[in-house]
A protein has these predicted regions:
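Substrate-binding cleft/loops of secretory-pathway carbohydrate-active enzymes
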Residues: 160, 165-171, 182, 186, ...
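Short beta-strand-plus-loop segments that form exposed binding edges in beta-rich domains
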Residues: 558-566
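Short, surface-exposed beta-strand/strand-loop-strand elements in extracellular ectodomains
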Residues: 508-521
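Substrate-binding cleft of secreted/luminal carbohydrate-active enzymes
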Residues: 91, 243-423
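N-terminal substrate-binding region of glycoside hydrolase catalytic domains
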Residues: 22-125, 281, 286-290, 294, ...
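An active-site-proximal structural segment forming one wall of the substrate-binding cleft
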Residues: 80, 114, 118-160, 193, ...
Length: 580
C-alpha cells in the first residue's frame, strides 16, 4: 500500500513537454453525435458516431481486488462489431463500493438537498485508504484496456477522467458538514489530489506499451462565468502531457444566448477550429435540458440552434441522452444531428468539404463598444435596464425579451428555469454563426432579424429564430460572403454546390445570388421572384466554373443582391466542394 501511495503522489512529477506539440488524436471521423450510453444500434440511428461506457466503481469492484470488466468487454465488442467509436469513464467518489468505508475511508455528509436519495454520503478523497484503492482501480482499468487486441483498442476514441463527484469534478455536492473533510473545488488540497490523479491517468493510458489514448478533462481552464480559477490545472496539462487531450465543455450545445458563451468561444475556439500548434477536441452532452421549459417551447428549433451554436464554438462530440435520441425521429429534430455531423469534423479549411454561415445577431450587453454606457447604462451582468434599452434599439427588427428574470441567471439556471426567448444577454455570441464562410461587414450591409413571421410557437420553423435581410430604405441592398483564405488554393474553375435558405415574404420581390467566377464582374448563379407564401424555402445550385478566390465585390466569393425596392430575408448559406 505504501508503494501505491508513493506512486500516486510521485506521478505528478512526470516530464514536461511543449504545448505546441500536443495534438488530439481522436479521428475526425469520430466527430459528431454520440449515444451517451450504449443501448442504441447505429443501424436504427445512423447519425450515431459512437457510444459510451460509464460504470460506477461499485459495479466494477464489488469485492476488494476482484474486478468485473464484463460490461466493458461488451461495450468494446459492440463498438468493434458496429465499426463505431467508444469512450470510457468510471464513476468514482460517491459511486465507490461500500466496502471502502470498512477499509478506513471516512464517510463525508454534506448539506446538499438536491441529490438526496441518490448519494447519501461521499468518501474523503485524501484518506490514504481511498488513494490506495483509487490508484489500484485505475491501474487495473488500464491493464484491462491494454489487454484488448490493437484493432479493438483502436475503437476507443478517448477516456474521460472523473476524479470526484460525476464529471463536474467537484469533491461533493454541497459543503461537508464536518469541516475537517471540506474540499472546495478550488482549494489547494483538492487541486493537488486532482493533479495526482491526472498524472495517474497519463501514466496508465498515454505512457508505456500500447497506443496512447486521448484523455478528456473538465474544469481545467476558464468557464462560462469567466472563472479563471483552474489556470493551474491548465498549466499542468499543457506542460506535462505529450499526447492529445480534450475538454468537457457543455454550455454551447444546450441552448443559445447563454450567459458567458462568448468567453467560452474566445478561450477555446483557437484550439479547436483551424488550430495552430496545440490541438484539442471538445465534448458536450445533452442531458435532460431538452425537457426543460425553454427547450420545450419549440424542440426542433432549440436543437437546431444548439447545434449551430456548438459548431460555431468548435464542438467535436455531442453526447445525446437516451430520452432525446428516442424522441428525435418522432419530434423531427434528428435533422439537427445530421447537420452537426456534417460540420463537426471540418476543422481544417484546406481539407474541409463544407462551409456555412448561419445569419444571426446576439445583443451582448457586455460589449461597451457596440452599446456605449453613456447611452445604454453601466455595463453590468445585473443591469437589466441596460439590456432592455439595447433590445428596444432593435425592437423594430423583432428583438424582444420574453423572460426578464432569466437575464440575471447563470447559464446553468437558464437551462433549468428560463421560460422564454431572450435576444439580449450577458457575454452572448454577437455575430453570425459560421464555419469557414463569413459575411463581410454584416451590420453595414444588412439588418438583423429575430422571430421572423411572428412570435415563436411550438410550430414555428427552425429558421424563424434568427435571420438577416436587406433594408432598401437605408441602402442595404447587398450581402457579401467570403470563404476562409485557405478553403481554395488556386484560381482554377471548380465544381461548387451552394445551398441557401430564404424567406418568401413578399409577392413579386426579386433578388439574385452572384459568385466569383474569376471575371471582372460577378456571375449570376440564379435569380428569384417571390410568391409571397410567408414560408421558408431553400434552393441548391451546382456551379462548374466557380473560382471563389475573393475576386468579387468587397473581396467576396458570393453575394446576395436585391434587384428591386423590396426587402428580402435569408437564414443560412452553405458551400460544398468535392476534394480530389
Amino acid at each position: 500500500m505504501r508503494h501505491i501511495l508513493f506512486l500516486f503522489t510521485a506521478l505528478a512529477l512526470v516530464c514536461t513537454y511543449s504545448a505546441t506539440n500536443i495534438k488530439a488524436e481522436v479521428p475526425l471521423t469520430a466527430f459528431g453525435v454520440w449515444d451517451r450510453g450504449s443501448s442504441f444500434d447505429p443501424k436504427d440511428y445512423p447519425f450515431l458516431k459512437g457510444l459510451s461506457f460509464n460504470a460506477p466503481w461499485a459495479d466494477v469492484e464489488r469485492q476488494p481486488g476482484l474486478f468485473d470488466w464484463s460490461d466493458l468487454d461488451q461495450a468494446v465488442e459492440k463498438a468493434f462489431r458496429n465499426k463505431s467509436f467508444l469512450y470510457l469513464s468510471l464513476g468514482v467518489g460517491p459511486e465507490a463500493p461500500e466496502w471502502i468505508y470498512e477499509k478506513g475511508v471516512p464517510k463525508v455528509f454534506t448539506d446538499d438537498t438536491r441529490h438526496q436519495g441518490k448519494w447519501e454520503y461521499y468518501p474523503y478523497y485524501l484518506a490514504p485508504a481511498y488513494k490506495f484503492h483509487f490508484t489500484r482501480l485505475i491501474t487495473e482499468f488500464g491493464r484491462h484496456v491494454r489487454s484488448y487486441p490493437r484493432d479493438k483498442q483502436d475503437r476507443i476514441a478517448f477516456i474521460q477522467l472523473k476524479t470526484g463527484c460525476t464529471g463536474d469534478e467537484a469533491a461533493y455536492k454541497g459543503a461537508a458538514k464536518d469541516p475537517r473533510y471540506e474540499l472546495p473545488k478550488t482549494s489547494p488540497a483538492w487541486r493537488t489530489f486532482r493533479l495526482e490523479a491526472f498524472a495517474l491517468f497519463v501514466k496508465t493510458f498515454q505512457q508505456g506499451p500500447g497506443r496512447p489514448i486521448d484523455l478528456l478533462f473538465n474544469s481545467v481552464g476558464g468557464d462560462a462565468d469567466g472563472d479563471e480559477r483552474y489556470t493551474e490545472e491548465w498549466g499542468w496539462l499543457t506542460t506535462h502531457l505529450k499526447q492529445g487531450f480534450g475538454i468537457k465543455n457543455g454550455a454551447l450545445s444546450r441552448g443559445h444566448h447563454l450567459k458567458g458563451e462568448r468567453a467560452l468561444y474566445e478561450q477555446w475556439t483557437k484550439f479547436l477550429i483551424d488550430p495552430k500548434g496545440l490541438t484539442l477536441f471538445r465534448r458536450s452532452e445533452m442531458d435532460q435540458t431538452w425537457r426543460k421549459p425553454w427547450y420545450q417551447l419549440n424542440v426542433p428549433l432549440s436543437f437546431y440552434w444548439g447545434a449551430v451554436n456548438a459548431l460555431n464554438g468548435g464542438q467535436s462530440v455531442w453526447d445525446i441522452t437516451k430520452s432525446a435520441l428516442e424522441a428525435s425521429k418522432e419530434e423531427g429534430f434528428d435533422s439537427s444531428f445530421y447537420f452537426f455531423n456534417k460540420y463537426a469534423g471540418q476543422i481544417h479549411p484546406e481539407t474541409a468539404t463544407d462551409a456555412f454561415c448561419a445569419l444571426h445577431k446576439g445583443l451582448d450587453a457586455a460589449d461597451t463598444k457596440a452599446y456605449p454606457e453613456d447611452k445604454f447604462g453601466k455595463a453590468s451582468p445585473q443591469n437589466v435596464s441596460r439590456m432592455l434599452k439595447i433590445t428596444e434599439e432593435y425592437a423594430r427588427y423583432g428583438a424582444k425579451v420574453d423572460d426578464k428574470d432569466a437575464l440575471l441567471m447563470g447559464q446553468v439556471e437558464q437551462r433549468r428555469s428560463q421560460e422564454g426567448f431572450n435576444d439580449v444577454g450577458w457575454q452572448i455570441w454577437p455575430d453570425n454563426y459560421s464555419r469557414f464562410l463569413y459575411q463581410i461587414d454584416a451590420d453595414k450591409t444588412s439588418v438583423p432579424l429575430w422571430r421572423v413571421g411572428g412570435p415563436i410557437t411550438k410550430s414555428s420553423p427552425i429558421y424563424a429564430r434568427f435571420a438577416r435581410g436587406f433594408e432598401h430604405a437605408s441602402g442595404k441592398d447587398a450581402m457579401y460572403f467570403k470563404l476562409h483564405d485557405r478553403f481554395f488554393k488556386d484560381d482554377k474553375a471548380k465544381v461548387v454546390t451552394i445551398h441557401l435558405v430564404w424567406y418568401d415574404g413578399r409577392e413579386g420581390s426579386t433578388w439574385k445570388l452572384l459568385y466569383d467566377a474569376g471575371d471582372p464582374v460577378m456571375k449570376t448563379a440564379f435569380s428569384v421572384t417571390g410568391a409571397g407564401t410567408k414560408k421558408w424555402h431553400d434552393k441548391t445550385v451546382t456551379l462548374t466554373d466557380a473560382v471563389m478566390r475573393h475576386g468579387g465585390t468587397r473581396g467576396s466569393d458570393i453575394a446576395l443582391v436585391n434587384t428591386d425596392d423590396r426587402d428580402d430575408i435569408f437564414s443560412i448559406l452553405e458551400v460544398h466542394r468535392d476534394l480530389p
